[in-house]
């Protein structure tokens, strides 16, 4: 008999939930280290994503689209707000209609939209992307028997795998 430690990735909700085996190890410590490292990367990515969502929400609350429409409505520019924020530097004459503070907000909004648009549909806190470890016994007949599974929070507290 041999113990096998699988680091798995889980994501999604309800019928969209899926798990993938990412790594297999023969030692608890190696699997634990990899699982915690990967979860740390997910946590950092989710934190970064939240920053960009919060930035968009803050700028939306400031109604920069309304301000844009009000100012450009007095001109004949004919460029919609979303076309403008896709690449504001391509429209220097429109950008020049606004003070430096507003220009910075438009550029920040464009950057935030770019980041948010690049986020995977399953890479958000609502789909709970997470890594965990599943422990199996590889039996003499070649079959595998599931022993237990541990999330990253539980793994941080564990120094070794304890068996009953």
Annotate the PLM regions.
Residues 14-16, 77:
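Short glycine-rich, basic-tinged beta-strand/loop micro-motifs
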Residues 37-164:
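Short, mixed-charge low-complexity intrinsically disordered segments
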